[in-house]
């Protein structure tokens, strides 16, 4: 059976969309008529992109971490309840409210019914199910423990999503504060200051230096502010485009690592992500060398990723994991000590998971400290700007009062 997307009209004339499984489009139309729906369009499961490699179908837009965690959790629950994987996929598709996810899961189910493994079926959708996910599922199928492995994958995906949300929420307030501050300063300089200071200019009196400087800045903002804003947006777009070039991206990532506080945050983020990914792969039975290659792909910083790839090569040649990672110079000593302990005790996956949690807690503390320092800095900055503007307006008034006196 294959999956078909349909567009139909109900008895009241409203359009209905959905996905049905059937042997042919003709059977789908018959099923729709039995449900008192008038079929308008029926076609095989729609995909976003079709490559030229043997007609392999892929979705150009992947699943969000939240959707992936939810689908994985549902599959884990159903598989552990002794439901066959094809039935679990059908139930998860029926449970989803997203037509796109329904289509994807039913397409995976169709591949499973053709005799492919679950991991092999997921390989048809690489943007939705990353290599880490597929390798872990393959290891679970090979070991005969697919249910527990899916449960671990759901936990891993949810933890990654929660960590990402914590960082985003921690950075949200400073960003809003900075944007609001810049907007207020721009409004004062572009509209308020010119009207107030114009009175003193018309009086013909000699203005203090601070007032003249403020008038100059205000005139520049009024004349060129919009153009400067457009140029800034263009610069951001150009920078993002330049980051697509490998050479520029590596130089930028190297620069970030050299910035004192930023470099530490980047290392903490990437090493924690690497450790948690390596933990779930090794726990699921993926060979260490293969797990290292997969875990390296989740590292965002190219410099650190390249060093980990070199470390994986050393492990392949017989070196210990601890020595290989230590040679990169990118991993904190505590993490290396815990990995060494895991290698000696044979509990590498547990030590990796523990050190990843410790690193994530340390990262959260670092971000909290930065946010705590940033807030008073922005308040002091705003207070200083307002003070300068007030002084620039008051100084001519005081000078005028002295002349009158």
Swiss-Prot record:
The keyword Nucleotide-binding does not apply. The keyword Calcium applies. It is found in: Cell inner membrane. Its main location: membrane. Residues 1-168, 240-376 are cytoplasmic. Ca(2+) binds at residues 97, 151, 155. GO terms for biological process: protein secretion by the type II secretion system. One of its GO terms (molecular function) is metal ion binding. Keywords: Calcium, Cell inner membrane, Cell membrane, Membrane, Metal-binding, Protein transport, Transmembrane, Transmembrane helix, Transport. PROSITE patterns: T2SP_F. Residues 190-219, 398-405 are periplasmic. GO terms for cellular component: plasma membrane; type II protein secretion system complex. InterPro entries: GspF/PilC (IPR003004), T2SS_GspF (IPR011850), T2SS_GspF/T4SS_PilC_CS (IPR001992), T2SS_GspF_dom (IPR018076), T2SS_GspF_sf (IPR042094). The chain crosses the membrane at residues 169-189, 220-239, 377-397. It comes from the Bacteria. Pfam families: T2SSF. It is a multi-pass membrane protein. Belongs to the GSP F family. Component of the type II secretion system inner membrane complex required for the energy-dependent secretion of extracellular factors such as proteases and toxins from the periplasm. Type II secretion system is composed of four main components: the outer membrane complex, the inner membrane complex, the cytoplasmic secretion ATPase and the periplasm-spanning pseudopilus. Homodimer. Interacts with XcpR/GspE and XcpY/GspL components. This is Type II secretion system protein F. The gene is xcpS.
